[in-house]
């Protein structure tokens, strides 16, 4: 992965202009053998100030706001007592919720200043293995925490959980993990009606 020349500057200016607790920009997926599509700029694109609830809603619906840490600049105080889970995949998921919950407001810009290089051997692209269920467990905990702390976002949280379960489920293509496949399919059946048409 790599960043644009304006990566930190844009995040810092957005945070300062908004008086926010953290700022977030966007990333571009760059595939092997393909050129970068976006053009870096120091102009803040589509600058927005988001409330805590609106920010969480965007994260849950994956509307331009992701759980990934590299596209964000946080005030250090948000991380007091928060640690990334050791030895787990997709460790950004639980941390993103905890720090967003503590923020009063966030700044968002559409600048694509982080370039996420896609290799066939990356965690996201590698064949299914049971360690990928860390993602499902994190998203289930996220859903339960949102239901407790922000009940008005319960259905959005269910939608995010369902999306994650489907993502992992569709990666299973062998009989070796049939038991896991069936368990994930039960989760899809449990949440699909409640999650679809949530807006």
Model-derived features: positions:
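Non-membrane alpha-helical structural segments and their capping/turn regions in soluble enzymes
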Residues: 5, 129-137, 178, 182-185
């Amino acid at each position: 992965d790599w960043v644009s020349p304006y990566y930190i500057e844009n995040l810092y200016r957005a945070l300062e202009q908004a008086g926010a607790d953290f700022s977030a920009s966007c990333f571009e997926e760059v595939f092997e053998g393909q050129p970068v599509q976006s053009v870096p700029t120091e102009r803040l694109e589509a600058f927005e100030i988001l409330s805590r609830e609106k920010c969480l809603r965007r994260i849950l619906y994956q509307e331009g706001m992701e759980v990934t840490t590299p596209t964000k600049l946080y005030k250090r105080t948000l991380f007091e007592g928060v640690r990334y889970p050791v030895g787990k995949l997709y460790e950004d998921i639980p941390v993103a919720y905890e720090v967003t919950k503590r923020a009063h407001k966030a700044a968002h810009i559409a600048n694509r200043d982080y370039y996420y290089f896609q290799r066939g051997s990356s965690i996201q692209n590698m064949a299914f293995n049971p360690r990928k269920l860390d993602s499902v467990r994190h998203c289930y905990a996220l859903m339960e925490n949102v239901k407790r702390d922000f009940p008005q976002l319960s259905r959005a949280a269910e939608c995010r959980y369902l999306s994650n379960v489907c993502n992992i489920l569709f990666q299973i293509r062998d009989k070796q993990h049939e038991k896991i496949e069936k368990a994930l399919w039960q989760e899809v059946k449990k949440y699909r009606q409640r999650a679809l048409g949530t807006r």
